Amino acid sequence: MKTQKIALIGGPSTGKTTLINALKSKGYYCMEEISRQITLDAQEKGIDQLFLEDPLLFSKQLLLGRQTQFLEADSINDKLVFFDRGLPDVVAYLDYLNSSYPESFKTICRKHTYDVIFILKPWEAIYEQDNERYETFEQALIINNFLIHSYKEFGYSLVDIPFGTVQERIDFIINHLAEKK
């Protein structure tokens, strides 16, 4: 059985992790977002915002972690595996910062492809900032555009998840995947 790899993408505070947690509670296999853990590990070493202080180091760690998750999904015996963000997010955020990075980043993104990409657009009603999520809502709108550009650059079609309750958004995802069969 080929496992379908499905990425939920979007800027900060768009509801991705909430949906991943809801999908997990319904029995779906989900790969969690790892950027918060990388940030927390750096903070324990005295680096407040590794992404801002050394975006390339942060992004290398993130790319490696997401690549590991992607490869791990190949051994999962489930029809669907959901990812909280995908590999091209790394490139999108570096482009947002106008930061250079090795061509190998794009090579990895081209090599490991997802079957479906769902995008959650910025939604001011649910937007929150915290110690790891420092971007303003206006910055989230800009990041969203970089994400769209990055994924399209790698040949993806994006499926917009409409605003709604968590259950409505989950239903939309599951119904879309059922129609795609």
Model region roles, listed by residue range:
Residues 15:
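Conserved glycine(s) of the Walker
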Residues 11:
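P-loop (Walker A) phosphate-binding loop of NTP-binding proteins
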Residues 24-65:
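Conserved substrate/cofactor phosphate-moiety recognition/catalytic segment
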Residues 59-112:
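Glycine-rich phosphate-binding loop used to anchor ATP phosphates in small-molecule kinases
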Residues 8:
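Hydrophobic anchor at the beta1->P-loop junction of P-loop NTPases
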